[in-house]
């Protein structure tokens, strides 16, 4: 039995009745605590009454703390309204709202430099509530229960800039919030135009997703437009995505409904860095350098780094060793990222590199040009691995290579 209204086993019926009884004290604080609503929490915790109750009570506290009942009337800051990509557009064949996330033009760093993380998260909470409100309106309009949404992730242009650690962490917070407070609202999620970097990006966010959510993700290949049309009527799908829907002015991207983001002008910036915690600190003597080695076992892995220096600039470059088991000078190794000096004492530096071949990669902090000052450098380096299942699927389908 699916655990949905009209498809409950006797044991599930009993669990639903008991659950309603156990949480009756908090039901008045919830917008529409019908059987459909309660069953979402039960399904999310496999009908474990104790876990379902704990989850729902935590959600009630969340609604109170974040003032969720009034969040729809809240207006996000201008920079978020203008540049946070995505939007609701059309309905699938069952009448469920369709939400688009447009990844490529999203300027994640610009958003975190221009708005608070709390305002960004609050905007996503507001989006969730607006989608649930739309589900309620669709239920009344169609005369059948609509309680889930279809999502389309447009990954064209997904690049290394999207792997910036603070952005991934902020997105992880949103996913955690979504999983904990809007369970069983995702019907399915289509990933379209996924580049070769997608398996690495997916592996970063996968820990924040429940097993049930992961099963609802479909990574589509070159025939993605045909697949979408099996789930969404052409008149409900923008021309950009294979349908016939346009804006009133004929725009095929339906920009009146879907925000396509873009680079944020620096006049919106309220900060030029995001506070970081670093895993390592090292004192580099004058006229010296410090090398950190990372073994890359297969192509497609991504090196991600952040560093800052104190008092003055520092050189940084990445090299590939040509001899194993011994320290090599920079001139003896293959240069991968040219060495240059960074003002990381003023603004912390960060970056990513897709490793095209296996081997020992050396990240080299350079102070050889300084004959007077030692430098303290704090840094974090990670090796990001691709999700193998997603990678295999993309290889089978012939993934789009990012430009």
Curated annotation (Swiss-Prot):
UniProt subcellular location: Cytoplasm; Nucleus
InterPro entries: CRAL-TRIO_dom, CRAL-TRIO_dom_sf, CRAL/TRIO_N_dom, CRAL/TRIO_N_dom_sf, GOLD_dom, GOLD_dom_sf, SEC14/CRAL-TRIO_domain
Entry-linked CDD domains: SEC14 (cd00170)
Domain called GOLD: residue spans: 275-383
Gene Ontology annotations for the cellular component aspect, listed alphabetically: cytoplasm; cytosol; nucleus
Domain of life according to the entry: Eukaryota
Keywords, alphabetical: Activator, Cytoplasm, Lipid-binding, Nucleus, Transcription, Transcription regulation, Transport
Matches recorded under Pfam families: CRAL_TRIO, CRAL_TRIO_N
Tissue occurrence: Widely expressed. High expression in liver and small intestine.
Residues in CRAL-TRIO domain copies: 76-249
Signal sequence coordinates: none
Protein purpose: Carrier protein. Binds to some hydrophobic molecules and promotes their transfer between the different cellular sites. Binds with high affinity to alpha-tocopherol. Also binds with a weaker affinity to other tocopherols and to tocotrienols. May have a transcriptional activatory activity via its association with alpha-tocopherol. Probably recognizes and binds some squalene structure, suggesting that it may regulate cholesterol biosynthesis by increasing the transfer of squalene to a metabolic active pool in the cell.
Protein name from the UniProt record: SEC14-like protein 2
Source organism of the structure: Rattus norvegicus
